[in-house]
Amino acid sequence: MIWHVQNENFILDSTRIFMKAFHLLLFQGSFIFPECILIFGLILLLMIDLTSDQKDRPWFYFISSTSLVISITALLFRWREEPIISFSGNFQTNNFNEIFQFLILLCSTLCIPLSVEYIECTEMAITEFLLFVLTATLGGMFLCGANDLITIFVALECFSLCSYLLSGYTKRDLRSNEATMKYLLMGGASSSILVYGFSWLYGLSGGEIELQEIVNGLINTQMYNSPGISIALIFITVGLGFKLSLAPFHQWTPDVYEGSPTPVVAFLSVTSKVAALALATRILDIPFYFSSNEWHLLLEILAILSMILGNLLAITQTSMKRMLAYSSIGQIGYVIIGIIVGDSNDGYASMITYMLFYISMNLGTFACIVLFGLRTGTDNIRDYAGLYTKDPFLALSLALCLLSLGGLPPLAGFFGKLYLFWCGWQAGLYFLVSIGLLTSVLSIYYYLKIVKLLMTGRNQEITPYVRNYRRSPLRSNNSIELSMTVCVIASTILGISMNPILAIAQDTLF
């Protein structure tokens, strides 16, 4: 009898929770319409996978790409609307959050065609791969709009768990298994550190979880200048440092880049940084409003270490993916300048603009690496020698993307760095900008070293990998080359026509 009553109570409670969730989704679902499109795409993928055979594989790519494109369209139609806080304060919609969501969707849209041929050649399970990519994208989008500590943590873990699964997707590869283990352990540790910092904020603010309410709670409890806030700031900064691969919290990055499947690395190298930057800008600027000098100092130290260590260690690498891992550590050091400058002096605008350029440069480079790896089976920098003699298009594409990453004019990377450093200089960050300029020159050295290898014509330097390289046709239906071409064009011409991009970035509301 008691069991029967308890069972009835459980059913009633479950029904109430379901009805409340349905009511929220029905009346406030329009505020997360782009996210709902991705959820619908995920459900459709699962249904088709259960009811179809291997011949329907092209439909999986079509559904994934279409849901991402429709989600981008829905996001663009919502641009310039008034900021809205929905779902009982858990989710915020404004231009600032939406521009980060757009960047994440753009990364995913470019990464899917980049992965098609790789998945077919390596015989990886396609449905699960696309499900993890879309779910990670969904987690990143919710992270960009999350307005309270619990939603931030859940969205972050949704993104992180999919990232761990993707990094270990080639289960028979020992390096992939090693990369997954390191990524999982370091990622779990960093999440624990981040949540510990959140718990300090929760306690000091009198039990508040919404970002703006935390500020009000700190004022009411008179704890905004207490030592506890400094402890919370340190733990949250360390947690964010792991997520952003900032030195000295970067140890996992080179191994994960080297061991994971290359399309996965391409996806994680940009989406993880965009999502973490969206979180860092809000979590530091809102709850730690009264400790701005302290977190500015912490970020300056981390940015300097990242720029110096990242670029110095990149010079010594023999693996292309490890070199790009250390290069990405240096690149995120430059982006931190924009966060430190903040909303004044166009700091956030310069950060958003550079991240857009970085997406095209980085994904273009990885597209070239995926293509070269599939045709030769090597990742060693030395084995790229003489590629121009066999495949001029691939060699030129890789050279343009690398030179753009280095910041050579008139490529997009030059204009992005110029604007970023100029904003930092105007804000008085003279030492930080000087370090950025010096390390940028250093990065050009190892990028030019690779470009020189690509263009060499001396037979004694050309390895068997390039000698036996099969030449690609002038006109190709290769989806990797499609992504590569789009990224190369963007890396080349976006900087010249960056005024409209700047205007949109400056129009974001924080």
From Swiss-Prot:
The record's principal subcellular location, in a coarse class, is plastid
Q: Which GO terms describe its biological process?
A: ATP synthesis coupled electron transport; photosynthesis, light reaction
Q: Which InterPro entries match?
A: NADH-Q_OxRdtase_suN/2, ND/Mrp_TM, Ndh2_N
State any single GO MF term. NADH dehydrogenase (ubiquinone) activity
Q: EC number(s) on record? A: 7.1.1.-
Uppermost EC category: translocase
Which compartments does it reside in?
Plastid, Chloroplast thylakoid membrane
Record keywords, A-Z: Chloroplast, Membrane, NAD, NADP, Plastid, Plastoquinone, Quinone, Thylakoid, Translocase, Transmembrane, Transmembrane helix, Transport
Q: Where are the transmembrane segments?
A: 31-51, 59-79, 99-119, 124-144, 149-169, 184-204, 229-249, 261-281, 295-315, 323-343, 354-374, 395-415, 418-438, 484-504
Q: Which Pfam families match?
A: Ndh2_N, Proton_antipo_M
Tree of life domain: Eukaryota
Q: Reaction(s) catalyzed by this protein?
A: a plastoquinone + NADH + (n+1) H(+)(in) = a plastoquinol + NAD(+) + n H(+)(out); a plastoquinone + NADPH + (n+1) H(+)(in) = a plastoquinol + NADP(+) + n H(+)(out)
HAMAP family named among the record's database cross-references: NDH1_NuoN_1 (MF_00445)
- Please describe the quaternary structure of this protein: NDH is composed of at least 16 different subunits, 5 of which are encoded in the nucleus.
Family per UniProt?
Answer: Belongs to the complex I subunit 2 family.
Q: What does this protein do?
A: NDH shuttles electrons from NAD(P)H:plastoquinone, via FMN and iron-sulfur (Fe-S) centers, to quinones in the photosynthetic chain and possibly in a chloroplast respiratory chain. The immediate electron acceptor for the enzyme in this species is believed to be plastoquinone. Couples the redox reaction to proton translocation, and thus conserves the redox energy in a proton gradient.
In Swiss-Prot or TrEMBL terms, this protein is called NAD(P)H-quinone oxidoreductase subunit 2 A, chloroplastic
